[in-house]
């Protein structure tokens, strides 16, 4: 079953799903802006198109991830994003 989610007054939208190849995941799009997300479980984020500038927990330097690149976020943590152009992503819940 698909589950639609909307965050930050509609600037981030995602569709959650479960598949045999991906497991539990969501795919979505972020509009330009700055966002902070919290995690309830470990997450693997893959940039599909565009770019995300990311500040991961325990780091002090921002890093840019572009299409095809992956970063991981630990359970029970926050990560910060800066988005300069509409960017799509795949988030796998590990």
Swiss-Prot record:
It catalyses: a purine D-ribonucleoside + phosphate = a purine nucleobase + alpha-D-ribose 1-phosphate; adenosine + phosphate = alpha-D-ribose 1-phosphate + adenine; cytidine + phosphate = cytosine + alpha-D-ribose 1-phosphate; guanosine + phosphate = alpha-D-ribose 1-phosphate + guanine. SUPFAM superfamilies: RmlC-like cupins. The keyword Glycosyltransferase applies. GO terms for cellular component: cytosol. GO terms for molecular function: guanosine phosphorylase activity; purine-nucleoside phosphorylase activity; thymidine phosphorylase activity; uridine phosphorylase activity. InterPro entries: Ppnp, RmlC-like_jellyroll, RmlC_Cupin_sf. Keywords: Glycosyltransferase, Transferase. The keyword Magnesium does not apply. Its EC number is 2.4.2.1, 2.4.2.2. Catalyzes the phosphorolysis of diverse nucleosides, yielding D-ribose 1-phosphate and the respective free bases. Can use uridine, adenosine, guanosine, cytidine, thymidine, inosine and xanthosine as substrates. Also catalyzes the reverse reactions. Belongs to the nucleoside phosphorylase PpnP family. PANTHER family: PYRIMIDINE/PURINE NUCLEOSIDE PHOSPHORYLASE, PYRIMIDINE_PURINE NUCLEOSIDE PHOSPHORYLASE. This is Pyrimidine/purine nucleoside phosphorylase. It comes from Salmonella paratyphi C (strain RKS4594).
